[in-house]
Amino acid sequence: MQQGSAPNSAPKISFVSLGCPKALVDSERIITRLRAEGYELARKHDGADVVIVNTCGFLDSAKQESLAAIGSAMAENGKVIVTGCMGAEPEQIEQAYPGVLSITGPQQYESVLDAVHRASPPVHNPHLDLVPPQGIKLTPRHYAYLKISEGCNNRCSFCIIPKLRGDLVSRPAADVLREAERLVAAGVKELLVISQDTSAYGLDIKYAESPWKDRSVRARFLDLARELGELGAWVRLHYVYPYPHVDEVIGLMTDGKVLPYLDIPFQHASPNVLKAMRRPAAQDKTLDRIKAWRGACPDLALRSTFIVGFPGETDEDFAYLLDWLDEAEIDRLGCFKYEPVAGATSNALPGQVPDEVKQERWNALMARQQKISARRLKRKVGTRQQIIIDEVGPTVAKGRSKADAPEIDGAVYLSSRRPLRAGEIVTAKIERADEYDLHGTVAGF
């Protein structure tokens, strides 16, 4: 039986964070609040006074991972607080683990704190109740996720995020910029801008202005990106929908204000499938825009995600997607095999695709993308690239170019004549490329 903390000592919290970067930011905010109240983080469940599990509920596989994490926490500790997307529909958790102390949905920070207080009241200690101005971060010190809004106004047929996280709620621009400035002052070299729909930022608050330094800044995608680009850090834009006004940020990339990188979840290319998904269907125009973007900014890297085996997807639809990829030349790609999600309207669509066909299409798409990636990376051999160092090994350092986001994209492996540090940005000569990664030598600091 775990003992927890000694009387009058700081209570200890064990934390499990699952799911996407948006959920990670939620975890960081909860931990920051708890540290400000004097709670300490425990390395193991059995050394904690209470365990918090921040769940993911987007796919059934993610729900199973969340349930397994709750089960482990119950077995090792017994005092468990559940929050996050799966907590928005608590029935499955209540049935599996009726003994959990509390279940709340995403962004319910006050409810989580109240549950922690009931399970293990805070003990004030002026030497412990100190939190850095940028808050507690769960990422390496040199990069951080910057969440600019919550929720989503889109109603894609395969997605239940609006049910779990609600409609779009944008933060005031000045609030975002103050957080970004604190992060950069604390040594963050790369800001990863995230939300459910980054390009819709400010729509819900009618692009309201807020005071920032000696001026007012509108809560608008372009305006926010421009101001973030003045802070001196790499700025990487994630979860951008291909709305026409996205064209406006390409100029900031050309000018070096934000990274030449767009993460756009196209999901498919066939008009028939996109219509069934309730996604923008003018992908012929999207190809023209991609060409225009790259014409203005040749270094632009595009990342995207796609779903194969969506209900009603025919062989012709899939062939259309492969042809579209050949023309679009997406640099970085993630692919998912469609799976039903409880509550999604796509579950009722006709033409469910057999699992073996989903697997065949996934294999074919990834093989095609591997060739595209290898071809695009080969063009970088002989060039000089700025690289941010993530890890330093005995002989080789691992970093990322401006075309690579952490954890989801490729890497650059470098040799150097002098020791390197994580977070350092160096100039490297690229000497070799494989399907997904680059290899080179540090040529400047």
Swiss-Prot record:
MTTase N-terminal domain location: 11-121
This protein's name: Ribosomal protein uS12 methylthiotransferase RimO
Pfam families, per the entry: Radical_SAM (PF04055), TRAM_2 (PF18693), UPF0004 (PF00919)
Lineage: Bacteria, Pseudomonadati, Pseudomonadota, Alphaproteobacteria, Hyphomicrobiales
Positions annotated to bind [4Fe-4S] cluster 2: C152, C156, C159
Subcellular location as annotated: Cytoplasm
Catalytic reactions of this protein: L-aspartate(89)-[ribosomal protein uS12]-hydrogen + (sulfur carrier)-SH + AH2 + 2 S-adenosyl-L-methionine = 3-methylsulfanyl-L-aspartate(89)-[ribosomal protein uS12]-hydrogen + (sulfur carrier)-H + 5'-deoxyadenosine + L-methionine + A + S-adenosyl-L-homocysteine + 2 H(+)
Ligand binding ([4Fe-4S] cluster 1): C20, C56, C85
Organism expressing this protein natively: Bradyrhizobium sp. (strain ORS 278)
Broadest EC class assigned to this enzyme: transferase
SUPFAM superfamilies named among the record's database cross-references: Radical SAM enzymes
Note on cofactor: Binds 2 [4Fe-4S] clusters. One cluster is coordinated with 3 cysteines and an exchangeable S-adenosyl-L-methionine.
Keywords: 4Fe-4S, Cytoplasm, Iron, Iron-sulfur, Metal-binding, S-adenosyl-L-methionine, Transferase
InterPro entries per UniProt: Elp3/MiaA/NifB-like_rSAM, Methylthiotransferase, Methylthiotransferase_CS, Methylthiotransferase_N, Methylthiotransferase_N_sf, NA-bd_OB-fold, Ribosomal_uS12_MeSTrfase_RimO, rSAM
